[in-house]
Amino acid sequence: VIDRIARSFIEPFSVGELANYSSSAIRRYPAGTQAKDLADAAIHEMVVRLGDPYATFDERRMRRKGKRISGIGIEATILDGRLKVIAPLEGSPAQKSGVEPGDIIVEIDREKIYGLTLKEAMDRIHGPIGTEVLLRIQRKGARKLGLPVPRARFRVREVRHAMFGDIAYIRVAFFGPDTEKLLRKALGAIKKEMGGAKPSGYIIDIRNNPGGLVGQAILLADAFLEQGMIVATTGRHAKGSRRYDAYRGDFVNGSPILILQNEASASAAEILAAALKDNRRATIMGTRSYGKGIVQTRFPFGAQGQIKFTTHKFMTAAGIQIHEVGVLPDIVVNGDPRPTYGAAATSIDRCPTAGKARDRMLGCAILFVNKGRSIDSFLQALPKLN
């Protein structure tokens, strides 16, 4: 385990450092402690000492038996010792109960969780199906609030589509194992609904998409590119780096694409957005994305369990590292009408509504496509605020 971490972790750690951490953890236990418990303590100490908010140690024999265990459907990280929600998964108990991107979970079942690792915090959230977990949440600009959230099995609908006139809308909520296959199915359905005609444009909505399988994001980017670099992953050593290029051809034959993103679009979602933006294949509308541009790898080691830690960073086709930077939109649509990030900008209050949810961001996206995808024409067409 020590050797694996020393060789693969994204930041340099010596074998000696890790061995010292391991030894100090073992010395805290009394004589006669079982070897397996000492091994768990040593591994846990090393993982914590990495300072990697995404690092976890999963002890296989600690997995609960006899009960069906479930979570609530959130992607989260540890930030300054606090559990921060990247985004609730679409259709999850967390989303239905009112958990929002950016929420800070400060208590779980009335117990403070400051300083816990990501795994320790998530283990407290998980529990038997049919039970409830009480979250105390700090939300920006609001008082702390308590949210009871049921633990339940749920299924994320990875891809769905709709038509707004001759504009095709594709929602990608998460990158699961079938996302690319579901995209191809959606494109086929759109073609059938259009009677073989070509849509005037495609809107790909990755708002509140916390990521998922990187390989699926690469496949989706490849589906809209004729050629060009999609993403590169860089490890600590040159031999761990890899470049991914488009090769399958553009499934929509050059039709215009607009991507909707927000501050909860993360990881794999950012790979898709950056690849299409940097290859000048899509216009990005919304806000700066989350900025999770790192890859975690799982390393199983027999009956003891598995560890997961950061091994690579993403590099976009433009040579930018996404991590802690995010993908910048071409058109900023938020609550502030002042231009930011060097991009065109408008207040979301100026956007028309669209769909049953009266979605203003989507309304702006439809308007942009209808105005010939010209930023100037789009901004001129927006109604002025009183």
Predicted regions, residues:
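C-terminal "post-core" interaction segments
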Residues: 160-386
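PDZ/PDZ-like peptide-tail recognition elements
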Residues: 45, 51-87
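Conserved PDZ fold ligand-binding element
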Residues: 1, 5-7, 94-117, 203-205
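Amphipathic alpha-helical segments that form the core helices of the histone-fold
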Residues: 19-34, 43-47
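Terminal peptide-recognition signature
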Residues: 1, 42, 46, 74, ...
